[in-house]
Amino acid sequence: MVYYEPGQDRNGAALRRSGHVRWFYIMSNVIDERFMAEALKEAEKSANFDEVPVGAVIVKDGKIIARGHNLREKSNDPTAHAEIVAIRKACKKLKSWRLEGCTIYVTIEPCSMCAGTLLWTRIQRIVYGANDIKGGALGSSYNLFEVKNINHKVEITRGVLENRCAALITSFFRSKR
């Protein structure tokens, strides 16, 4: 498992030597922000249905192949988290349970159920917006991916459009109090 903070590149030394560091930072941030903005649109759909506003999109080869938002209340399904909804759609589209070469963009740090499912799909990369200190399974609460016997390594990028993602979820829960 490899973690990246916003603005940190994935090809570090090679890019620094090539002199293209600044361009890569800008391009990777722009791309991540573009897809996170799409995940935020999905999260807003959840909020419109009085669901916890979490959204996700799965990207392969620069194209969105699946979208999802929370549907737990509407479907009476405790597993209908945004990530799981998007994973099911992506697997169906690819006709495979493996999501190798895919990236998921999700507005909040995945819980243990979603992180475990992402691990088993062999997804390449997870990008999330806001930390979830109560239930996040990628380091905020605990880290599911630090289990020693897991062979699959996932690239994780945190904090993309963090303020917008956090504001959406905070606003939702404030309105419930």
Which ranges hold each PLM region?
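Helix-adjacent hinge/juxtasegments
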Residues: 76, 80, 84-117
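Zinc-dependent deaminase
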Residues: 23-49, 97, 110-177
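Short beta-strand scaffold segments in enzyme catalytic cores
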Residues: 54-62
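A short acidic/small-residue loop/turn micro-motif
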Residues: 71-74
